[in-house]
Amino acid sequence: MISFIKGVLIEKDPTALLIDVNGIGYEVFVPMTTFYTLGDIDSQVSLYTHFIVREDAQQLYGFKSKVDKKVFQELIKVNGIGARTAIAILSGMDSKTLLHCIENKDYALLATVPGIGKKTAERLVVEIYDKLLKMANEIYAQTSGTTTTSQDSQAQQAPTSVVLANSIFNESVDALLALGYKQKDAEKMARSAMGDATTAAEVIRKALQGSIKSKR
């Protein structure tokens, strides 16, 4: 069981990283809420991990905090929710927002996540309600502050060129597709979130936040 990983960040794409640990490269899948906190390429990275072994694949999932890892582990115990859907949930909302959804039984907001319909949202609330409430203090403690990342610091750069803007748009769409959104929806979300964004991470964050706000 691999429960934690620390190494050098070699590659980073939305939802997937390559981390060098003593010369061995580990592919680690992460939610966008973890991706936003990452440093630059060649920087040190430390993640809490959950290792899943299947007949056709072995996959490692990483999280910025032990709390997020525990929330992920509770999510994948829910009938009908696999690792990909759990990652999509934690990409669209942080643990605190998810807790609010569970407390308020906000089925409509949960159903905005790709792969979750109304019935699955209702089942999720029923199966995870008590467990998540027991973690409330941990969840609120870790979300009391805001982490500044290298992605955030790039927000003050000059407006992007057309070529760079297209690259950011395409990368953002690819990330949203990886999270389970349909092509048409992914393009619409990315286009609406572009604005003066200078990184794909910024566009993805705004797109996912916009999806949540539109349902409130």
Swiss-Prot record:
> Mind listing the GO molecular function terms for this protein?
ATP binding; four-way junction DNA binding; four-way junction helicase activity
Q: Which processes are annotated in GO (biological process)?
A: DNA recombination; DNA repair
The compartments listed are: Cytoplasm
Q: Region entry Flexible linker: which residue ranges?
A: 144-163
Keywords associated with the record: Cytoplasm, DNA damage, DNA recombination, DNA repair, DNA-binding
Q: Which GO terms describe its cellular component?
A: cytoplasm; Holliday junction helicase complex; Holliday junction resolvase complex
Q: Where is this region: Domain II?
A: 65-143
Q: Predominant location of this chain?
A: cytoplasm
Stretch list, region Domain III: 164-216
Tree of life domain: Bacteria
Q: Which InterPro entries match?
A: DNA_helicase_Holl-junc_RuvA_I, Hlx-hairpin-Hlx_DNA-bd_motif, NA-bd_OB-fold, RuvA, RuvA_2-like, RuvA_C, RuvA_C_sf
Q: Where is this region: Domain I?
A: 1-64
Similarity comment: family membership: Belongs to the RuvA family.
Domain notes per entry: Has three domains with a flexible linker between the domains II and III and assumes an 'L' shape. Domain III is highly mobile and contacts RuvB.
Subunit comment for this entry?
Answer: Homotetramer. Forms an RuvA(8)-RuvB(12)-Holliday junction (HJ) complex. HJ DNA is sandwiched between 2 RuvA tetramers; dsDNA enters through RuvA and exits via RuvB. An RuvB hexamer assembles on each DNA strand where it exits the tetramer. Each RuvB hexamer is contacted by two RuvA subunits (via domain III) on 2 adjacent RuvB subunits; this complex drives branch migration. In the full resolvosome a probable DNA-RuvA(4)-RuvB(12)-RuvC(2) complex forms which resolves the HJ.
What biological function has been recorded for the protein in this entry? The RuvA-RuvB-RuvC complex processes Holliday junction (HJ) DNA during genetic recombination and DNA repair, while the RuvA-RuvB complex plays an important role in the rescue of blocked DNA replication forks via replication fork reversal (RFR). RuvA specifically binds to HJ cruciform DNA, conferring on it an open structure. The RuvB hexamer acts as an ATP-dependent pump, pulling dsDNA into and through the RuvAB complex. HJ branch migration allows RuvC to scan DNA until it finds its consensus sequence, where it cleaves and resolves the cruciform DNA.
Which NCBIfam families does the UniProt record give?
ruvA
Q: What is this protein called?
A: Holliday junction branch migration complex subunit RuvA
Q: Which lineage do the record's taxonomy fields give for this organism?
A: Bacteria, Pseudomonadati, Pseudomonadota, Gammaproteobacteria, Thiotrichales
